[in-house]
Amino acid sequence: MARNKLDGVIEAVRYAPGGKIDFVRFYERHGVVWSDAILLERKDLAEQLKLGKRVVVGKRRANIGSVFETGPAVLQKEANIMTEGQSGNGDNLDGIPVF
């Protein structure tokens, strides 16, 4: 069975006072390697999703730099960014820590 390639993993999120995502802690795939953690603003995350990049929530496994424990996909529904299976208004990345 072929593994689906991921383009990015969101490890943590910070919400602005209005409930929208302010920025996320993000790992980006570069070929067979992954970036260090970067802080990605909401507009840049929305652009990644608009380009069709496959982004999921997850966390990097300790001492194994290129292995992640992954969760649901992150989708953009209209103006909202949410994890797969979520509904409602506003941004909602369920199951990842807030920092």
Where do the model's predicted regions map?
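A generic structural signal for short, solvent-exposed coil/turn residues
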Residues: 2, 18, 47-49, 73, ...
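Short, compact, well-ordered microdomains
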Residues: 61-99
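Generic surface-pattern signal
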Residues: 15, 50-54, 86, 98
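Acidic, aromatic-enriched beta-alpha/helix-loop junctions
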Residues: 28-73
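Short, surface-exposed beta-edge/turn micro-motifs
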Residues: 7, 21, 51-54, 77-79
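Short, surface-exposed binding/anchoring microloops in extracellular/periplasmic proteins
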Residues: 2-33
